[in-house]
């Protein structure tokens, strides 16, 4: 026999009615829909929130909100929550706002009330100065609600823009994210995707097939691997949803709650005595200037516990970006990677590094730059695709940054790429060079071919010509291809033993912790987008 319905005209009845409604809101998606979600290896909206937030900290907002649409019979199905779970809680004890799209209700599609819930929690985060994590798993705009859905998308975009650089915004893509829905993650600071589960695209495979005749699958078009390796839309490719959420929590641990506060710190005074581990850096640079080495080694030797949280690891691997700590304080790392394209800068690397430097600057995180760059990658593709304009973004990012900037030149720093990579001339506070540094307009081979073209051309015997060329190369290297010409002019503040790098960075950051620098008043700069 079913239980008698509670009398809602009594206090006990009203309380029982509330409990019933809460239960209904918590399980708004059908059991079958939840089962299908789990069968795909995906979690539900609430399970994701539970994994992200500290246990028992989640406070839900608008759980009883329901859509008001009457088109196409949708009025007969008005589940609580309307397909998105919103609220706030804590991650490692720090306040965070969150919204999680529920694919088990209307396929996670965005309608008016759904959008209003997201807008409300974003406004709440902005007023209270706490990060926003958006968990995306939805089918785009709710067709039944027409232009109203599009209007709410734009309301969300506007808030993404207003919150940019004020509170950290992280997008977690754990399912489909198509059409207009992709632009919100695109504006946020970091986007995390799950391999084989996440898909992002403006137009899907069917539309592309109809319009262009191209055959392309979901994974190839907009999968996690595509956006992590080719487009640069995403910052991390996770193996599963738990890995993705752990990465998000890792990011939050390095970021402040807002632009007016400092990043979380776990102060621990560094031992400034040079250790055997530090001395490993003295043997890092090969004798041959053309032999690569792994810049990760230099980075990890400088950071606490050798811990480096890399961002966009699979995109533009010729430059490394990510977070670490020095004496328990957050730092951002930008570094050329000689293992890829010899560390050359290209369009993708320039834009990747520029965006990262600007993110660090927005959130009060010092930037440490490791330089080993032979120049910009040559080629017609680079020129035609706009390396001049797009490479200039990196200049803009360093020159406008007011956070502490420390640069370490480990080997090559040639031509315009020397200027671009956090040089003293762009406003870096502390510029260090290893004895292996080669700071010059170009490498010895190219310089000799230009400077001594006539001299070499006058030597008819090929063997004698090669011998003379080697002599001239040696002369150029001895004269200019070193850190001391730059040191004489104050372009580098010190030439140091590689093993002393961490000590110099620790002392530099201690001094720069109270740095204050103001740029000329302006509405905003005009970065070459």
Give each language-model segment a name.
Residues 1-529:
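Ligand-binding clefts of soluble mixed alpha/beta catalytic domains
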């Amino acid at each position: 026999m079913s239980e008698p319905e509670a009398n809602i005209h009594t206090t006990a009845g009203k309380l029982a009615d509330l409990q019933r409604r809460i239960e209904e809101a918590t399980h708004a998606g059908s059991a079958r829909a939840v089962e299908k979600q789990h069968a795909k290896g995906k979690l539900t909206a609430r399970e994701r929130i539970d994994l992200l937030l500290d246990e028992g900290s989640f406070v839900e907002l608008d759980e009883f909100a329901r859509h008001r649409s009457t088109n196409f019979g949708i009025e007969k199905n008005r589940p609580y929550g309307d397909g998105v779970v919103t609220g706030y809680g804590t991650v490692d004890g720090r306040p965070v706002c969150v919204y999680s799209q529920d694919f088990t209700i209307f396929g996670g599609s965005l309608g008016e009330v759904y959008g209003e819930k997201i807008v409300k929690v974003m406004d709440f985060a902005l007023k209270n100065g706490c990060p926003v994590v958006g968990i995306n798993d939805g089918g785009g705009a709710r067709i039944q609600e027409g232009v109203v859905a599009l209007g709410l998308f734009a309301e969300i975009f506007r808030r993404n823009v207003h919150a940019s650089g004020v509170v950290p915004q992280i997008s977690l893509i754990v399912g489909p994210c198509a059409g207009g829905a992709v632009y919100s993650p695109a504006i946020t600071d970091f986007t995390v995707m799950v391999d084989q589960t996440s898909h992002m695209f403006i137009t899907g495979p069917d539309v592309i097939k109809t319009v262009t005749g191209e055959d392309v699958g979901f994974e190839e078009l907009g999968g996690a691997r595509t956006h992590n390796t080719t487009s640069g839309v995403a910052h991390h490719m996770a193996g599963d949803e738990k890995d993705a959420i752990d990465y998000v929590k890792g990011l939050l641990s390095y970021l402040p709650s807002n632009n007016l506060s400092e990043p979380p710190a776990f102060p621990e005074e560094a031992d400034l005595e040079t250790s055997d581990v530090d001395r490993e850096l003295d043997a890092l640079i090969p004798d041959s200037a053309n032999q690569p080495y792994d810049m990760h080694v230099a980075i990890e030797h400088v950071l606490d516990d050798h811990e480096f949280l890399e961002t966009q690891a699979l995109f533009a691997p010729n430059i490394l970006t990510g977070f670490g700590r020095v004496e328990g304080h957050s730092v951002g790392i930008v570094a050329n990677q000689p293992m890829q394209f010899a560390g050359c800068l290209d369009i993708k690397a320039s834009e990747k590094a520029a965006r990262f430097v600007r993110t660090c600057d927005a959130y009060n995180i010092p930037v440490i730059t490791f330089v080993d760059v032979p120049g910009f990658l040559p080629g017609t593709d680079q020129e035609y695709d706009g390396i001049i304009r797009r490479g200039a973004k990196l200049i803009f990012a360093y020159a406008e940054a007011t956070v502490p900037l420390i640069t370490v030149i480990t080997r090559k720093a040639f031509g315009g790429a020397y200027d671009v990579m956090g040089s003293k001339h762009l406003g870096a506070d502390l510029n260090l060079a290893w004895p292996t540094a080669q700071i010059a307009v170009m490498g010895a081979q190219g310089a000799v071919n230009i400077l001594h073209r006539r001299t070499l051309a006058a030597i008819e015997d090929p063997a004698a010509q090669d011998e003379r060329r080697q002599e001239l190369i040696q002369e150029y290297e001895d004269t200019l291809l070193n850190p001391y010409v730059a040191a004489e002019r104050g372009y580098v503040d010190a030439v140091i033993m590689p093993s002393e790098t961490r000590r110099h960075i620790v002392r530099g950051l201690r001094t720069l912790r109270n740095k204050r620098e103001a740029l000329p008043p302006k509405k905003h700069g005009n970065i070459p987008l």
